[in-house]
A protein has these predicted regions:
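Short amphipathic recognition helices of helix-turn-helix/homeodomain-type DNA-binding modules
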Residues: 58-65
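Residues in the recognition helix of alpha-helical DNA-binding motifs
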Residues: 22, 33, 62
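Residues in the helix-turn-helix
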Residues: 18, 29, 58
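DNA major-groove recognition helix of helix-turn-helix/homeodomain DNA-binding modules
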Residues: 43-58
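Recognition helix of helix-turn-helix/homeodomain-like DNA-binding domains
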Residues: 25-38
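Short basic helix-loop element that most often maps to the first helix and adjoining turn
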Residues: 3-22
Length: 65
């Protein structure tokens, strides 16, 4: 799953640890999601959407295939 977490985080000058704290997950989880190695749970995706005040589909996009 592609996502814009890294871009959104950088726009706010947040570290991965800052985002992890806001989402109540580990920094390693944020890193794995940003790299596309881990897909977030639906509750975590909603939490990120609320945090950035964006629709989920603007942050996360399914990759065809």
């Amino acid at each position: 799953m592609k996502n814009k977490l890294k871009v959104l985080r950088a726009e706010r000058d947040w570290t991965q640890a800052d985002l992890a704290n806001a989402l109540e997950v580990s920094r390693q989880t944020v890193n794995a999601i940003e790299k596309g190695k881990f897909d977030p749970s639906l509750p975590l995706a909603f939490k990120a959407a609320r945090l950035f005040n964006l629709p989920i589909e603007e942050i996360f996009q399914d990759e065809p295939g």
